[in-house]
Amino acid sequence: RVLGNAQFRKEMLELNVPSGIYSMIAGIDLVCVGEDEWYVLEDNLRVPSGVSYMLENRKMMMRLFPDLFSAHRIAPVAHYPDLLLETLRQGAPDAQEDPTVVVLTPGLYNSAYFEHAFLAQQMGVELVEGKDLIVEDDTVYMQTTHGKKRVDVIYRRIDDDYLDPEVFNADSMLGVRGLMRAYRAGRVTLANAVGTGVADDKSIYPYVPDMIRFYLGQEPILHNVPTHICSEADSLSYVLDNLEKL
């Protein structure tokens, strides 16, 4: 299922991801089915999106319903950008003390551009497009009014296919030519890593609990929504016998 997945990237074979971290940001969709009973509906590890709307929604709720927040123990979320920046900085290659972090956006016309700009502003980092970055000697640089500045961590909001025209879609005008060379050389960190979209796939989703047990030796804290893979005989038989209930 992994090798046949459209998001599987053979370009990542034998590539040592900086700091060994593939997914720094995960967007996990949850559904509540009862009191204190939550299920994981979906895993989003490729280019998770939507957190800015949650942050803005919370600000509005606090202004409109202050009594609600004073009467209940509602966990704060305003510090999310600080946690995000700290996470990105910790993933920098070469153990640099003051790494340069940027947010890479497809541009103004992308549907999530507001979030890209919002997070960059909240973290105090540069919002860049592919044309703002260049690769020289397997190192990524940002072109500024003061000259070139090395980039250590890229929080990329661009899909794999458009990241590097040397490696993926040759017609891409959104990515950075040579980015994968710098990535393979361990000179830049991409968040999230190329190929993490495999984990988004619904054919992988049913096996996540088994992955947790195998790799962590633990029982999953949250349940998965029951999912049937019809390429497996037992699941197919169950689905055919219970179509009216599904």
Which residues are covered by each model-predicted region?
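Domain-scale recognition of functional cores that engage charged ligands
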Residues: R1-L246
